[in-house]
Amino acid sequence: MRNVTPAAAARYIFGYTAAQDISDRTIQNSESQFARCKSFDTFTPLGPYVETKIDPHDLSIQLFQNGQLRQNSNTSQLVFNCFHLVSFISTNMTMLPGDVILTGTPSGVGPIESGDRLEVRIQGLAPLVNTVK
């Protein structure tokens, strides 16, 4: 799909899921490109499933690290809503079925360590829970 308007974007979205967008800050701070610092094998878990019938524009979103709330926001606070993001991205590249768009992260980003338990909760979706290795 190419050049989709925000009004038409919903027709091209299969569904929504949680993600943990992990970065290696040592690499990120020493290189000008983010690709390598976000590309290790376990760095972007998704899931645990895709919800196909949900309005993405006003959902609470939280991250817990070892049971402590670290991030707390709402999708209504996104700078650009999901439909606008799909439209914008489709003006620059062809999008194919199965492509995934991550919308960003709320404030509260911090260091993680091996053994930490991370839990993403987005209203209406199953929680995404992982242990850092």
Can you describe what each PLM-predicted range is?
Residues M1-T5, I54-P56:
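Short helix-loop capping/hinge motifs at secondary-structure junctions, enriched
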Residues T17, R25-K133:
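Catalytic-pocket segment enriched in acidic/His residues
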Residues N3-F14:
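N-terminal accessory regions of nucleic-acid-interacting proteins
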